[in-house]
Amino acid sequence: SNTDGHIRSLNRRMKDRGWDARLTLVEQSLNSVVEIGDDLVDLSTIENPPPVQYAVWPFVEYGEHNIIAADGGTTKSLMAMAMAVSYSYGKIVMPGTSVPLDPKPTLYLDYESSSATQARRRRQLLAGIGIAEEAGKILYKRMYSPVQDAATELYDLIASRGVGMVIIDSGARAVGGETSSEEMVIPYFNAVASWGVTILTIAHKPKDSTSRGPAGVAQWWNQARNYWELVKDQTPGQNEVHLSVRHDKANDESLHVPLSYRLAFGEDIRYHGLDTPVSTNIMSQMPISTQITNFLLNSPQSTVKEIAIGIERSDKVVDNEIRKNEGKLYYGSKEAYNRRWSLIEDKKEDPWAIL
């Protein structure tokens, strides 16, 4: 066995030291501290399991590992702080979201910024919604080593302060830069899962824009229960940014429609909700259905070819998306060929509409 092999190896170095008994004590000590999972549960004993819950709906699912990813310089860290303020103060920072009735402290583990920067962001976000600062709501810890190296220390901190959500900014530094190593990424997910709280990891997108999920191995995508991507457009010299947040993965519910914002900077910071992206750059990165819907809002009764030209996609891609959502999002005219398509919400105003 492995234990016998260790004993023989140790005896070659130092004989007659009672290695068998010593290794038994080591095994007992390890078993007492190493987490191997929760207690066994008979699922039939769980009565009336609750529906999916959120720390901040729809961005952060309660008790799960959530990821928000974006390119560098897209205000993703500011959005992370907005999630912390929403959750811990119980107030809506970003329109279109909702917050729990029982706020708890947030722990912000930061590899990329400073306590002064994060305190300023928190203060400006609170000023933007007219809320006074309170102590003990958002706890901050500057990090330097990978999370798994400090997992036990952090667990003690989380438990002692009643923390309900942990934000890790960013995932790349939290695994020591080894984003493409499963030997680092999987232990990271295991470590934070052992804390038993809601997790939000901030991650970077890969340089290849066609890749799915954060930069690194597929486990970033596979292990996330809820995954959003943030897309930004800004005119140089302006004190506002246009943003859209696209929902790419949901393990427990259907995908949410993209949410768009105008983020205004000044003495305070405010998120203003938008019905649709005002930036063509942002719109081009939204789901095909969103692009088609936006086109038909402005140009109803359009053919597939007209839509395809308008959104710069192939006829086949547009036709497949429309057929998939016919009667749900779109309705077509009665012609057998070259049907003209409009939004289903406009059907009441069109007496000639035939599904």
Question: Which residues make up each language-model segment?
Answer:
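Short, small/acidic-rich helices and loops at N termini and domain boundaries
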Residues: 1-35
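The Walker A/P-loop phosphate-binding site
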Residues: 29-127, 132, 355
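Short gly/ser/thr-rich secondary-structure transition/capping motifs
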Residues: 47-54, 148, 208-211
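Amphipathic alpha-helical transducer elements in NTP-driven molecular machines
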Residues: 53, 115, 119, 148-152, ...
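CheY-like receiver
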Residues: 59, 153-157, 191, 295
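Phosphate-binding/switch region of NTP-binding enzymes
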Residues: 67-68, 73, 78, 165, ...
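Conserved inter-motif catalytic segment of the P-loop NTP-binding fold
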Residues: 101-183
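C-terminal regions of RecA-like/P-loop NTPase motor modules
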Residues: 159-160, 236-355
